[in-house]
A protein has these predicted regions:
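Structured domain cores in non-transmembrane regions
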Residues: 93-109, 120-122
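Signature of long, low-cysteine stretches enriched in small and polar/charged residues
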Residues: 110-174
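N-terminal targeting sequences that direct proteins away from the cytosol to non-cytosolic compartments
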Residues: 3-94, 128, 135, 163-166, ...
Length: 211
């Protein structure tokens, strides 16, 4: 055998032996990313509201879809932000209503249920008994049917109107809430009224009166 080939063969053999005996290379450690805690979004639960000027000591809670738009001594109104829904807490002890015929301002009726049923500007259902915040009251659903916009209820800082539009109203009259007559008024478009009733029930359930 050629000496050069023999030497190359021997060198290759020795190289293979050295390679087989050498320790295997240790792979570089893989970096593990730090664990990130998932972001927790706080739920938007009902928030209590209590007026500083309202004559009754009342607390009412509502969610992010509602907000207070009236804050008077005799009226707090909670309204839907996205929909034309209103829940008004009217202290009517000294309020006046509009006579449906003459339009004159007259004292709030002693027998409101009979008055609203005889009012030609409304088509009213039969009254039912309800309880709000532990106080018994009378509930009447009614549909305004005026031919033009008219005044209805006068409060100290504002008033309620009836309009010739497809609306439905719910009256809840509590005759004695710590010495005051309180008329809770829910107004919503006719096609949204049932939904408004359901979603506003939690507002009514949250009401608390204190002395």
């Amino acid at each position: 055998m050629n000496a050069r080939k023999l030497l190359v063969s021997i060198l290759m053999f020795v190289s293979v032996l050295i390679s087989s005996c050498a320790p295997a290379a240790t792979p570089a450690p893989t970096a593990v990313p730090p664990t990130v805690a998932p972001t927790v979004v706080a739920s938007q639960g009902p928030v209590p509201f209590s007026s500083k000027v309202y004559k009754l000591h009342m607390s009412v809670s509502f969610g992010a879809d509602w907000h207070a738009i009236d804050d008077f001594t005799d009226l707090v109104t909670v309204a839907g932000k996205q929909k034309d829904w209103n829940v008004g807490f009217n202290i009517v002890s000294n309020a006046k209503v509009a006579d449906p015929v003459s339009g004159a301002q007259i004292p709030f009726p002693a027998d409101f249920a009979s008055w609203i049923k005889s009012n030609p500007d409304f088509k009213a259902d039969e009254p039912t008994e309800v309880t709000v915040a532990g106080f018994k009251g009378t509930q009447i659903d009614a549909t305004p049917i005026p031919t033009k916009q008219k005044d209805f209820l006068y409060m100290s800082g504002t008033k309620w109107n009836i309009i010739p539009s497809a609306e439905q109203w719910r009256f809840i009259l509590l005759n004695d809430v710590n010495g005051e007559r309180l008329l809770v008024l829910l107004i919503a478009p006719t096609d949204q009224f049932n939904d408004a009733v359901q979603q506003s029930q939690s507002i009514l359930d949250s009401v608390v009166f204190t002395k």
